[in-house]
């Protein structure tokens, strides 16, 4: 769009951005399944799932451009899953009663990131973008109250360098690593957002932190982070704990295995409490319910802080090959970490810090309280209220980057009619 862009990342390549860890999918209101989805329904589900605390104008725009995101990504070559006839496949996610989530097995974030990286590489090749890897932003340069560049540290040489610009865009994710353990990569340190805050950018809703219900439980004293298991597993997996406290005690002592507990002694507590949604309740509901069961003594691992996510019924109904096709890489990851096969035994999961709905305050045009400083994706506060729906993080990041920021930033950097009159 005519911009010359300096792109900075703290990693050795943009391909190592934490979006690569997003597994389950990306939402869009395409209604390919003809199950009643629409732009308005996606808007409503997002606002309701966020406890009515999101900025509704931003959310409606997000729902409107969601369909364009899928078209853009397909054009970039992102290998979304397809049905037998060749049409794009969908699945359901928590907080929705329609199938609107597009996915690429359990690697959706990775494939979307590679699609975006290929487009970035093309712009680097033609000279419109210059890439700076292994740089950490230290400060925002303000001139007459407007963002006019940054100070960044070269992490290879240790030198501080300055870069001038007409506008600055922050797209650095959330602050989940403020907690001792989270699912965030260690590079997600919130240093860029904090630098903006120190310069006077407003921060909004910092208390809104999402606790994801399906993470591998803590299994050692020397962990630096927790591992996410995709919410998409709740499509076919069933969450349960024993009905009897004595069975829970045996599980915690290691004298009983989950697969040996008969069906009549299992409490599928989400299906029992929320029959309309079943296991696909919103994340905050599933996390609170799991903690409540464990606090009552029904936890299933040696710490008592885990519940079962069981695929035995899905394997019997669909066959092992179909389940492996949908979730094979996630099962492999789980087995690599825990040395337990989800095909043979129920997975153990427990809630963990995952996503931050709060962030830098932005207006409708994604500009912060500092003129010329924009914040997009997870590092702003605008779209998810008090709780994000599953598969909406990728949707927001791509909507902001592909379909909102190019136009709002262009509007900011272009001469105004008043400027033209003066000239």
Question: Which ranges hold each PLM region?
Answer:
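Glycine-rich FAD pyrophosphate-binding loop
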Residues: 3-20
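Glycine-rich active-site loop/strand segments that organize a redox cofactor
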Residues: 28-61
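Conserved redox-cofactor binding core of oxidoreductases
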Residues: 74-159, 171, 215-229
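Core beta-strand elements of the Rossmann-like FAD/NAD(P) dinucleotide-binding domain
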Residues: 158-166
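Glycine-rich loop(s) and the adjacent beta-strand/alpha-helix scaffold that form part
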Residues: 167-222, 384-407
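An anion/pyrophosphate-binding glycine-rich loop and adjacent beta-alpha core
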Residues: 195, 202-336, 407
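Short FAD-binding loop at a beta-strand-to-alpha-helix junction that anchors the flavin cofactor
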Residues: 369-387
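Conserved small/polar residues in nucleotide/adenosyl-binding loops
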Residues: 412-419
């Amino acid at each position: 769009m005519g911009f010359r862009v300096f792109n900075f990342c703290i990693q050795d390549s943009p391909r190592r951005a934490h979006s690569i860890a997003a597994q389950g999918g990306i939402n869009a209101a395409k209604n390919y399944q003809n199950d009643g989805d629409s732009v308005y329904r996606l808007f409503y589900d997002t606002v309701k799932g966020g406890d009515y605390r999101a900025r509704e104008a931003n959310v409606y725009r997000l729902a409107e451009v969601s369909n364009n995101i899928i078209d853009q990504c397909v054009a970039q070559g992102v290998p979304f899953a397809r049905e037998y006839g060749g049409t794009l496949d969908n699945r359901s996610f928590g907080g929705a009663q329609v199938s609107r989530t597009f996915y690429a097995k359990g690697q959706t974030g990775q494939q979307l990131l590679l699609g975006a990286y290929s487009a970035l590489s093309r712009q680097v090749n033609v000279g419109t973008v210059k890439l700076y890897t292994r740089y950490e932003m230290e400060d925002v340069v303000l001139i007459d109250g407007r963002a006019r560049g940054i100070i960044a540290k070269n992490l290879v040489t240790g030198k501080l360098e300055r870069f001038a610009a007409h506008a600055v865009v922050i797209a650095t994710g959330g602050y989940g690593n403020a907690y001792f353990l989270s699912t965030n990569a260690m590079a997600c340190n919130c240093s860029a957002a904090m630098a903006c805050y120190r310069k006077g950018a407003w921060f909004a809703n910092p208390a809104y932190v999402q606790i994801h219900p399906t993470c591998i439980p803590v299994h050692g004293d020397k962990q630096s982070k927790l591992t996410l298991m995709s919410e998409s597993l709740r499509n076919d997996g069933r969450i349960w704990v024993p009905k009897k406290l004595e069975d829970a005690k045996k599980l915690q002592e290691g004298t009983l295995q989950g697969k040996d507990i008969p069906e009549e002694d299992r409490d599928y507590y989400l299906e029992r409490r929320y029959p309309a949604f079943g296991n696909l309740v919103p994340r905050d509901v599933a996390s609170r319910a799991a903690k409540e069961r464990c606090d009552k003594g029904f936890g299933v691992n040696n710490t008592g802080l885990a519940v079962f996510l069981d695929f035995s019924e899905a394997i019997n109904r669909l066959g092992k090959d179909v389940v492996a096709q949908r979730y094979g890489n996630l099962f492999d990851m789980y087995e690599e970490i825990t040395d337990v096969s989800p095909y043979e035994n129920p997975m153990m999961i427990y809630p963990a810090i995952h996503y931050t709905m709060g962030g830098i305050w932005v207006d409708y045009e994604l500009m912060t309280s500092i003129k010329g400083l924009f914040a997009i994706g997870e590092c702003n506060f605008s779209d998810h209220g008090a709780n994000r729906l599953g598969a909406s993080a990728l949707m927001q990041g791509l909507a902001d980057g592909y379909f909102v920021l190019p136009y709002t930033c262009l509007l900011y950097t272009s001469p105004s009619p008043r400027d033209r009159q003066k000239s």
